[in-house]
């Protein structure tokens, strides 16, 4: 019998073969091919990472850091390749959420039945 980790590796391969993953790959390639979108996407990722790192240390971001993040997010969301990427990311996240519900169903049942 395969171990849980073997099953997880199989699921990772299945994820890569899914339409959602392929759509994400295509959408991301379109962002990278568009100089303006790629630059805006990069700026957003840098600003977001900066805030996340502070929060992971229990620190609050400075108002100017939050403003920079919001500004880069607004700029990025105005660009079609990034809008399209966001839709595809949401679809993939929905699928992963459903998979997570299936995987964790035994845990939920355990807590509800005891």
Swiss-Prot record:
Task: Give the InterPro entries listed for this entry.
Answer: Com_YlbF, YheA/YmcA-like_dom_sf
Q: Which HAMAP family match?
A: UPF0342
Give the family this protein belongs to, as stated in its UniProt record: Belongs to the UPF0342 family.
Which protein, by its recorded name, is this? Answer: UPF0342 protein OEOE_0901
| Annotated source species | Oenococcus oeni (strain ATCC BAA-331 / PSU-1)
Its organism's taxonomic lineage begins at: Bacteria, Bacillati, Bacillota, Bacilli, Lactobacillales
